């Protein structure tokens, strides 16, 4: 791509641009999903220790989510701000945003590595780790934490490539890392006989290569916004609005940690190991829904943000509705597939007959509200694209903090089958959050567009 791509966002066909930018983003999200899925498959097949090792690595998931959340704080907050600045023709400010966010990511890597490396055993115990699973969680987690700088750079800086219109380059970042991880996993785990440690090393190495790829692009000739050392000194007026906007994504991702612990602790109490195992599968299936949605909205975000900054309001409307209907259509189709083919989805992740039976039952409950997720995600992320940090944050908090997590603990008091009640919390919160978010967005949409004209 070239600088003409940036100009096309203000004049080219909205639908064509959505396809050009959303498809690579969706592919990137799906490939990114393979990181977790492939790791779980390989680790779960380590002779003799596969089950315990897989459980141990799963216990590290809340910390992994927190690291991701901090990356999103800078990346998801800074990229829309940079796009808005580009739309206004203020390239200097946009480049300062890129550099300031990079500085924040480097500082976060130092802090997070220090905190999590030392406290990892204690945290895993709090998450439910046992004497059997704790060693695997700590072994995997400490290696991953030592390489967190690469994870933060990849997840935090890649959005700045997408927001410039280089969706294909952004996708390659993920493809390169995923392919390297898929190749290195069996080599380090089985050939070098390093087990769980090998899986962690493979992941860190793949992220390191992706990080180098990103930095070479952002400091090269093809990029529109160049990462420059002179812009890396933090400026409050530059970085604070980015972090304010990124809080919404930070909350969305970080609350997954709390959510994970809430589900597993409750299901362990009411349903035992098979319920916790089913939850692991359900989480993976749920990612098949949410991650492509994130990709679709990543494709729509630059179009919405750029044209909002350029005050081309009809194009903002067209871009949003294109994003909205694709998201709703995708979740509706997935919802129907889950209802009619629950055992197929369960069987993808496990061959254990008892676990397949239980998961097939649970998946119809847990994902009963999937059709509504497209409404909630597309509207909530559109608020972000329009620079509405406060409203986006409220909508992000609504589903998980205000509805889902409390319902996990409240609903079992009203049902004889308490495990059923825990699973039921998911669709109830999905539908309620979608209704509130959609009504709120369409109520404010016209006001937001009018404000952009002033």
Name the predicted role of every residue range:
Residues 9-49, 62-77, 81, 106-113, ...:
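N-terminal transmembrane alpha-helices
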Residues 144-162, 170-178, 199-212, 294-297, ...:
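Short runs within selected transmembrane alpha-helices of multi-pass transporters and secretion channels
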Residues 30, 34-54, 124-131, 187-194, ...:
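Helix-terminus/linker motif at the lipid-water interface of multi-pass membrane proteins
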């Amino acid at each position: 791509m070239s600088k003409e791509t940036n100009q096309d966002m203000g004049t080219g066909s909205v639908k064509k641009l959505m396809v050009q930018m959303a498809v690579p983003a969706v592919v990137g999200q799906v490939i990114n999903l393979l990181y977790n899925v492939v790791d779980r498959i390989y680790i779960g097949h380590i002779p003799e220790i596969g089950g315990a090792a897989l459980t141990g690595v799963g216990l590290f998931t809340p910390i992994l989510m927190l690291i991701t959340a901090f990356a999103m704080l800078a990346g998801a907050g800074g990229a829309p701000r940079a796009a808005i600045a580009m739309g206004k023709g203020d390239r200097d400010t946009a480049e300062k945003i890129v550099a300031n966010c990079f500085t924040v990511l480097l500082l976060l890597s130092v802090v997070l590595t220090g905190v999590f490396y030392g406290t990892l055993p204690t945290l895993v115990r709090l998450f439910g780790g046992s004497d059997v699973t704790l060693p695997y969680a700590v072994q995997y987690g400490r290696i991953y934490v030592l390489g967190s700088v690469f994870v933060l750079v990849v997840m935090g800086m890649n959005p700045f490539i997408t927001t410039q219109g280089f969706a294909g380059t952004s996708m390659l970042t993920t493809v390169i890392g995923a392919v390297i991880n898929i190749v290195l996993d069996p080599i380090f785990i089985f050939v070098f006989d390093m087990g769980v440690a090998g899986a962690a090393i493979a992941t860190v190495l793949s992220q390191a290569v992706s990080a180098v790829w990103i930095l070479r692009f952002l400091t090269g000739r093809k990029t529109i916004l160049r990462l420059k050392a002179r812009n890396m000194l933090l400026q409050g007026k530059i970085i604070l609005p980015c972090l304010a906007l990124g809080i919404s994504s930070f909350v969305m991702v970080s609350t997954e940690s709390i959510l994970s612990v809430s589900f597993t602790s409750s299901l362990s109490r009411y349903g035992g190991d098979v319920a916790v195992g089913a939850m692991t599968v359900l989480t993976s299936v749920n990612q098949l829904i949410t991650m492509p949605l994130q990709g679709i909205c990543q494709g729509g975000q630059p179009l919405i943000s750029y044209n909002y900054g350029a005050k081309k309001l009809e194009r903002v409307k067209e871009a949003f509705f294109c994003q909205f209907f694709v998201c709703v259509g995708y979740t509706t189709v997935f919802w129907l597939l889950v209802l009619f083919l629950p055992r197929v989805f369960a069987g993808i992740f496990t061959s254990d007959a008892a676990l397949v039976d239980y998961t097939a039952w649970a998946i119809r409950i847990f994902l009963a509200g999937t059709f509504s997720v497209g409404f909630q995600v597309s509207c909530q992320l559109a608020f972000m694209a329009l620079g509405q940090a406060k409203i986006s944050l409220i909508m992000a908090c609504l589903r998980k903090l205000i509805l889902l997590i409390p319902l996990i603990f409240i609903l079992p008091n009203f049902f004889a089958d308490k495990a059923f009640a825990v699973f039921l919390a998911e669709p109830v919160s999905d539908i309620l959050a979608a209704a509130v978010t959609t009504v709120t967005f369409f109520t404010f949409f016209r006001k937001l567009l009018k404000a952009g004209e002033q």
